[in-house]
Amino acid sequence: MKTSYWDFRKYLEKYAEDFLVQMENMYSIAPFERLDKRFKKNKNIQNRRDDAIYKTLWKNFEYGLGEANEAEMLDFSKSIVDDLDLDGGPVGIKDTMDDYWEEQYRFIEGLNEYVGKWIRQVRLFKAAPMKATFIDNSEDYFFTFNYTSVLERIYRVPSNHILHIHGGLYPYCDEPPILGHGNVKKIEEYREKAERAAEEYDEGKESIYNAVANYYERTFKNTNECMAFRGKFFRQLTGVNNVEIIGHSFGEVNMPYFTYLKYCISKNAKWKFYYHSSEDYNAAEKAVKELELDIGDYEILPSDCFWQ
């Protein structure tokens, strides 16, 4: 299924290009193909550009959302305040600047709405089961980061045995899809900077610092809140003795879920991590260390072993 974050970018490029351009601009990705149509026709140039864009933001999209070009935002603010040439210093401008930054950066509120629209147009009618033991499986529990209803519709797994931790599609999931970074420290950092600027009566800095914090709040995914809201599912897992993880990159944003999962299940549980590439293998090794699993309690295996 075409459900990677790069597939999401392709969707935005086709159906919401203005939003995509605005968002990528926040991460120093310029839309040069708009300036010269020849770039779209030259596949080599386009492939090199796509590779650069992928590495800059989309390879680890959720983490990347918390790494906007803050320096550019701050420089932009400074140039505006300097152009005002205020005799009495940067005071009496906060409301005007707040309104301006809101107009500039509020667009990002539409991100999760576009995620929902993208997932709703993913078609499953050509999908076929790849693992027979999943079909009509009412013994295992499925903890999925995938927004689609493939487990419910293709494998016919009971909905009460599935947790779409980041939301999904109605009627299989009541919560809409969400994504975001997990860097709460960035938000706190800029709120503190805004407070200090306010104490120094520098309304220009106060305004832009709050604007940066607002941007990060709108792209933030509260993992603690996600887990607390779905506590009923986690409380069912006390007797789980085996955990198998496949198709996950073990990104920093989502590691708290696995830490909490370890807390909820049997202390003697065995873990299997399946990898597709050498990069996945290294990520699994890092996850094992972070989870503090003993050598005899886990295996790291090629993904082919899972599907056999």
Language-model features and meaning:
Residues 171-181, 281-284, 308:
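Short, charged, surface-exposed secondary-structure boundary motifs
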Residues 1-3, 227-308:
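SIR2/sirtuin-family catalytic core signature
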Residues 124-139, 152-154, 231-238:
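A short acidic-Thr-Gly-centered motif at the start of a beta-strand
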Residues 116-124, 219-226, 249-250:
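Short, flexible loop segments at the rims of nucleotide/cofactor-binding pockets, characterized by
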Residues 1-138:
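Gly/serine-rich nucleotide phosphate-binding loop at the start of the catalytic core
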Residues 185-238:
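Acidic, metal/cofactor-coordinating or nucleic-acid-engaging core segments within structured domains
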Residues 145-148, 248:
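Short, well-ordered beta-to-alpha junction loops that form the rim of enzyme active sites
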Residues 1-45, 52, 141-144, 156-172, ...:
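Conserved catalytic core of sirtuin-type NAD+-dependent deacylases
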